[in-house]
């Protein structure tokens, strides 16, 4: 990786409000040291993503609203510079990475931005090959983007940013849907980018993986910078202070519940080497034999029983589960490497994914009917339909999930974590007996992580089947009674 020109970033007295909304940023001042890694953290809705949109020029060139103050890159005001210049200086990995794709295949996507800047064809091929190798996704090059798992999409977005070769890279929750092995890959990539002189700004709730890489920390609250500290200071603040600041774990969490192994895919997860190792990392204790899952197999009398579930894609078997039981009255976590089939399982249960003939799913001994299962998707944008938060969910659920103050806001104007909680509120309103949540803590801060976990435990106590698909061990430790490891 070659050295990159260093860029100076500064925010001077910036206040900003999205159209029709309250101020999101209030008199923010921030300096980003060239060649350093600056971590921006804080509660959901505190303005972290908005800061990144200022730095890459999306505000005010794409997002309208009321803006005052100055955003400078190399002493040039971003708001007055041509938008195409921003693309030469900054690359961004967005919180919802699928929203930044413009083509249909991974290879085409990595070439798209350089092509727009008339980079020579041979150089584009070299950049693409290097980015694919850097993220360990060479096997995905010819894949249709629509067929990728959430974690794979995240890695493609990171590769896309690398291929642009900009001096500044902005990352908004870059590990939100990644398994532990992939998080380690992202950490290694960030380390190499930093060593090459790139200026990095990372907005994250999950911060343990950045230990030893962070130079500067900016903690935001209610649209203002409330704390600044050196990177090494953050990891010395102690547990009490960490919780007071609303930050998530500073050390890599280990799963408290011993998982039961489930061989869910014929021939393993796509035949990918190392998938079992990734699953072992996800649980901390190691994947166990499939037979260990039998003690929780159940007879389906009080829970969800799945039998002979097979799903194929493009003629290839991608999911094969002979028998699996999820008890009512408990929260079951589902872990496993990216691409192993966790989301496919969830979609099949909710009749969003066609299964082979012969599959049987029963709830309480009776056939599982449509509408009895509800899925909170990874991409929650697909589940928000109305003009206001109050139209999406009932007042009691908004109150329970700390959204009542946002009742008049448009759902798509919310932060990533707020959108996540809103869709969970709508799921509770549906009174589904099987509730499946796919990576429900993407963009969620520590306080709301604990609140969501408590809500899920309450829902389970009401007799529901609650299934949580997650790589977030910190969250699973808060809510899961049992864990299944798909390998």
Describe the function of each predicted region.
Residues 169-172, 435-438:
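Catalytic Walker B motif of ABC-type/P-loop ATPase nucleotide-binding domains
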Residues 122-140, 394-406:
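Conserved ABC ATPase "signature" region
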